[in-house]
Amino acid sequence: MALFEKAFTEFGMAMAKGGEAVLGLGGAAWVSAGKVVQKYIAQNPASGSIGGWQTVSALYVTFSGIAVSLTCLFFVIGWCRESIDIRTDFTLENMFRFFIRFILTSQAIVYGLNLIRDFMELIAVLTAGIATPMVEVSSDGVFTGVMDNLEGAECLVPGLLFLLGGIIGAAVVLVCSIKIMLAVFSRFFRIFVIVPFAPVALSTFAGGQGLFQTGSAWIKTFMGYLLEIVVIAIALELSTKFFGSVSLFGTQVSGDQGWGTNTVNVLLSICETVTPVLATTACVTGAESVIRRCLGLNT
């Protein structure tokens, strides 16, 4: 009988340690994801450390050639539409307005890539000043204190619960780690995709009222993608400060408590470990919608 009790005790302890180890692997994945995020969160997409910008620049030049023709076309369309009544609308003041708009549009196309680089550098510097390491996930000793006070068959149920809890918690943390890295990397991809279309979009400003909506939509989209990383940095900063000093459930494992109470407390500790990860990931993945609603950038 003592042999069975010893076997049950060791088996339950092994399951608990396995759950703790698996949860620790999830925490290690989160830490690794945090290092990757810290490396790229303040990177300027136009810097040489990120591949693809040379291709984007070449495509911008190619689309600029198309935009020159479109600028002339939109200018003529806008002129004709706003000068139907020649006697009333065809004035010197309107002519100056048309040509000033045409010149500004042309300059925006020519120097647009430089302006884009300057804006991205500004946002990179701003983000670098805000960025902070992500909240850590630790599973050290999360299951100890309960199993040490149990023997025999009573170790099986909490051991199994701890194993399942560790696996589920690690899976949640792993998925969140992948999502938070994708949120940072997808921003670079979206910026690289829309930058070459800037000349074509900006050329619509030459047409004036009724035609410049395309250019306005491009600017709003670009600013949304650009400022998204600032919201991500703020979310990481706030989550680290908030969850780093707050105990959500106030759980405490003690030998004076029954194994049932301790088991519930340990499971709550797992939830307390996973909750900051979920909250941080939700804030990061929703950064784009937050910045669009905050600044009215919805197209």
Q: How should each PLM-predicted stretch be described?
A:
Residues 202-220, 290-297:
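Alpha-helical transmembrane segments
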Residues 70-104, 197-212:
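Hydrophobic transmembrane alpha-helix segments characteristic of membrane transport
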Residues 15, 19, 26-29, 33, ...:
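Non-cytosolic segments of integral membrane proteins
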Residues 1-70:
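Binding/recognition "hotspot" determinant
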Residues 59-66, 102-106, 178, 185, ...:
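Loop-to-transmembrane-helix entry motif
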Residues 64-77, 168, 173:
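Hydrophobic alpha-helical transmembrane segments
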Residues 7-19, 91-108, 215-228:
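Alpha-helical transmembrane segments and their helix-start/interface "positive-inside/aromatic belt" motifs
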Residues 6, 50-61, 86-98, 158, ...:
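Membrane-helix interfacial "entry" motifs
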